[in-house]
Amino acid sequence: MIILAFESSCDETSASVVLRTEVGFTVKSNIIASQIETHRLYGGVVPEIASRAHIEAISRITYEALGVAGVTLADIDLIAVTANPGLIGALLVGVNFAKGLALANSIPLVAVDHIKGHIASSYLLENAPKPPFIALAASGGHTAIYRVDSYTKIKTIGTTRDDAIGESFDKIGRLIGIPYPAGKGFDALSREGFIKATGDEEKFYEKYKKSPAYKDKEMTLPSPALSDGSLDFSFSGLKTAAINLLHRFEQKGEALDRSLFAARYTFEAVEAVAKKIKMALEENPEMGFVMAGGVAANSHLRRRLTEVCHSLGRDIFIPPVSLCGDNGAMIAAQGYYEYLEGNLADSSLNASALDSVE
């Protein structure tokens, strides 16, 4: 089966051609038109601008994806498209374009939930996970833990009660001079801080908690892991405390070591996620773990969650960094399983900004 898939839920327009055989998935093309440079001017995504950019890009990248894959629309067996959640204007561009192609060429169409798509990025791995397993979806808009019972049925077992981890990195990163989106720069600056704090270029994360920098009361930040026994997070408190810390340094006229600050912020965020993932795995014996979403590209989070899984003897599945962000290939993978379940869409398909993962 050859699948053509579209992703346009936020600020990246993607079209991908994926081949599914008895062996598994093969990504034949995965074209992504990024809007980062455009939105960087505003310090974040502007929905109206994002929608217009999707309109300008989607036809071009579709034919580029087909060309790179060496196929035509006549070869396509299935079209998949992200229908929710996301920016409504952005989603509508992808949904309407996909519907038009499907109807005009008599190709079956399936709608895909964006979060399920992120989790499905792991199905593109050579050694792909099989449900049931525990999954983390961490991005600029989501931070949640799921129990994946089957390829199409998942249940939310933990979530953020306010801000997403990626949004907090972007906000705090901007305040210390890291250009939007701050994820990659924050990761690198944190690494610099960890090494500075420990003097170790290899085991810097593991040694950080015993370093003088961690014990510095001027840099104290709260954990976003709620202590109520749930698997939920609250990143707003961490973010607010970090903003107040920055203001204190500014008011006292003291120079802030950006790298040590970034390391402390990253450590608290990552440790909170690690704590909840460990709890989730302990509550679900023998299940493996999938890490997905844009923040899954964070090297410190990847490192720490790998350590957690190994300590519990669980398998961990992490997509390559190239598949952590929004892309069409992950939508194709999930679309395949929606098709097998008979979850076909028709001309009445509409986009929704709301999360309906369950």
Task: Give the label of every model feature segment.
Residues 112-134:
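Conserved phosphate-binding catalytic cores of ATP/NTP-utilizing and phosphoryl-transfer enzymes
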Residues 127, 150-197, 239-240, 244-250:
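Glycine-rich phosphate-binding loop plus the immediately following alpha-helix
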Residues 320-357:
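Glycine-rich phosphate-binding/hydrolytic loop that grips phosphoryl groups
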Residues 13-19, 135-137, 143-147:
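Short beta-strand scaffold segments in enzyme catalytic cores
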Residues 111-112, 289, 306-331:
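Conserved phosphate-binding/catalytic loops in two-lobed NTP-binding clefts
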Residues 2-85, 114:
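N-terminal beta-alpha supersecondary unit
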Residues 30, 72, 188-289, 298-312, ...:
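A contiguous, well-structured pocket-lining segment that forms one wall/lid of small-molecule binding clefts
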Residues 73-83, 285-296, 317-320:
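Short glycine-rich phosphate-binding loop at a beta-alpha junction
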